[in-house]
């Protein structure tokens, strides 16, 4: 299994508005675009995210400072607001904010590469409109491959490769409501998912015919899985590089009604001890090795995560090794950038909403 990676970063400085005709060198431009999953579903260059997605991006746009390097910059809606919003968290975690830039400055930056939360048509169109060189942006063909790999079909295709003693899991792609009804009759209770959707959305725990027909009409199919009695959520975070797939760490996270709410911040050893209460660590290692060796992501380069879960089986627990593949950066990657070195120190990272989104870190009680 690959080694745990926790990118504590160097000190950066806030970038003041650029003077005209003065290029500021930026090694990597980071972008938090959490509406990415919905943008994939729309597949439109002129996509407008729902209000909640736009607000999440605006309120937490500073997040990449947690893993950015000294020569990097983070694209935000408002530079001053982003600098204020991240001050308390950065002080608490011993990090100094990196430089922030807004759209008006993009044409004045000498950018080496761009690392968004996830690539889609809408993001590329926005960057191009604001003066970013086309050579830094993915082609139509690359974006289409990313979109197809982000289809939940990819998870269903990987799942059989991860099956071994102690695991469970099936998933089927259906293109008609009749196929869904047949699976419902076979399994009794099923989960129906849209091929592309954001966290907590596009997932139904029934086979509502009208909803299924609508998703099939818009996205071409739905994914259907047997319902499993979940005990806990977790995931594995990876990075796809030119030399292969690298394991970055475990992600122990919490959800409410399918929507992400927070992560445990702990060392890999502490997280493995927690997971060992449910499933064999040898099984986790074997599944991780299969992902590294057998998952084919074509020419995709960047972070991605596999959502998994522990479920109740006959007389014990079973591992579902691939609930979903997120072909983008995830909150699990964010948690890894904040994880401690001390096995005794365990924190909780949470996202809450009270008129605005906030990310907080507190000690676990």
Where are the language model's segments positioned?
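Glycine-rich phosphate-binding loop of ATP-grasp-fold ATP-dependent ligases
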Residues: 170-173, 189-211, 232-235, 258-274
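Phosphate-binding site of ATP-dependent enzymes
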Residues: 206-261, 310-322
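Aromatic (phenylalanine/tyrosine) cluster motif
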Residues: 4-8
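N-terminal-proximal low-complexity accessory segments that begin disordered
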Residues: 25-66
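A long amphipathic alpha-helix within ATP-dependent nucleotide-binding catalytic cores
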Residues: 260-318, 355-364
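Short, positively charged and aromatic/hydrophobic N-terminal segments
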Residues: 10-14, 19-20
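Conserved N-proximal alpha/beta basic substrate-recognition cap immediately N-terminal to
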Residues: 54-69, 75-182
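ATP-dependent carboxylate/phosphate-activation module, predominantly the ATP-grasp catalytic core
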Residues: 238-290, 326-351
């Amino acid at each position: 299994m690959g080694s745990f990676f926790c990118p504590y970063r160097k000190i950066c400085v806030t970038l003041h508005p650029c003077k005209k005709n003065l290029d500021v060198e930026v090694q990597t431009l980071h972008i938090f675009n959490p509406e990415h999953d919905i943008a994939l579903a729309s597949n439109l260059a002129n996509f407008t995210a729902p209000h909640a997605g736009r607000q999440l991006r605006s309120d937490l746009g500073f997040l990449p400072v947690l893993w950015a390097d000294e020569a990097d910059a983070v694209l935000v809606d408002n530079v001053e607001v982003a600098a204020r919003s991240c001050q308390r968290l950065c002080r608490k975690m011993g990090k100094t904010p990196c430089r922030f830039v807004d759209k008006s400055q993009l044409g004045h930056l000498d950018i080496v590469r761009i690392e968004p939360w996830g690539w889609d048509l809408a993001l590329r169109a926005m960057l191009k409109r604001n003066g970013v060189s086309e050579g830094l942006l993915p082609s139509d063909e690359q974006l289409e491959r990313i979109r197809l790999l982000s289809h939940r079909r990819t998870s269903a295709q990987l799942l059989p490769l991860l099956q071994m003693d102690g695991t469970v899991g099936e998933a089927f792609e259906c293109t008609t409501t009749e196929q869904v009804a047949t699976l419902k009759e076979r399994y009794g209770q099923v989960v129906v998912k849209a091929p592309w959707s954001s966290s907590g959305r596009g997932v139904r725990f029934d086979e509502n015919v009208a909803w299924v027909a609508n998703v099939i009409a818009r996205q071409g199919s739905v994914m259907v899985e047997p319902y499993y009695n979940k005990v806990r959520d977790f995931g594995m975070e990876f990075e796809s590089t030119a030399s292969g797939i690298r394991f970055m760490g475990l992600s122990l996270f919490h959800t409410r009604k399918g929507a992400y709410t927070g992560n445990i911040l702990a060392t890999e050893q502490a997280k493995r001890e927690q997971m060992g209460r449910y499933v064999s660590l040898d099984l986790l290692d074997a599944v991780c090795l299969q992902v590294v060796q057998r998952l084919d992501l074509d020419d995709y380069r960047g972070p991605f995560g596999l959502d998994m879960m522990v479920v109740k089986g006959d007389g014990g627990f079973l591992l579902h090794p691939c609930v979903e593949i997120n072909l983008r950066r995830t909150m699990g990657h964010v948690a890894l950038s904040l994880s401690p070195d001390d096995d005794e120190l365990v924190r909780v990272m949470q996202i809450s909403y009270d008129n605005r989104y906030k990310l907080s870190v507190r000690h676990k009680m």
